[in-house]
């Protein structure tokens, strides 16, 4: 029974049906209490926390994350500890927009997964890590995305291949290598449609971004519209990002008043669903719109908010810590590869 409950929680979580995930996680908690099963209790905390976090219920999500961290540490269960570290990383990124803390949690999970040879968790954490690097606009994330992609293929795991492909595509887009990005995004789209993966807006946004870069505004617009249609079955950050993409095209077409409405809509969604990812860019473009309309008072007002949001995201001291962590990851990975090749010989 407990395996069936775990399967259902994971299934609905992957589909983005958070209320069903929470329902089954609560049933799991009741079963765990009755049968005095602490491991099952731990899983119920993890699933509840992930679903609550993704549906913008940040306070209760944090409480369940803390409970899972405490219990996983007490039970000395490395596999669930990897999941908890991963979830804490996503919480830091989505709710607190603290990308540095997010990366620290993800590195912790990656190290633990590496030590225990948890290949699947290791690959998924790499995909999440690459995504945070994209949000930081830092191309150093390419190696994590490609490693996730290669592991997905060697494990023949469609979801991990998809995660690796979509994150590699975002990275190549950041590096202005659009042809390479297109190669990976097409593979991601095929897998996403074959398996009906959740958050398809994330993939459509990148198609939109690449086409926008190429000056193909009409085609780009179609993809942003597709992404915005996905409201119920997409992550908040993807929906917000689609608003940003759509607004940038309207700005190109000198339709600033319409762009302003879309940007304000995106900001409203990001506050309503408690997810600050991309909010800084919405404010930046809002300021630009008002500037283009010669409404300098509003332009300045939104520019100040943009600066506040932006300054809290990027920090020189934290960048230094980050490069040290990256160096550590690289050297540990080298050691593991050397060990592995000695075993293979």
PLM region descriptions:
Residues 18, 38, 58, 78, ...:
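TPR-repeat structural position
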Residues 4, 18, 34, 78-79, ...:
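Coil residues (strongly favoring Ser/Thr
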Residues 35-39, 75-79, 98-99, 116-119, ...:
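Inter-repeat boundary and helix-capping residues of tandem alpha-helical solenoids
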Residues 26-33, 66-76, 107-117, 146-156, ...:
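Amphipathic alpha-helical segments of tetratricopeptide repeats
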Residues 2, 7, 22, 139, ...:
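Hydrophobic positions within repeat-based interaction scaffolds
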Residues 15, 35, 55, 75, ...:
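Structural motif corresponding to the intra-repeat A-B loop/turn of tetratricopeptide repeats
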Residues 3-14, 40-54, 79-95, 106, ...:
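Conserved alpha-helical positions within TPR/SEL1-like repeat arrays
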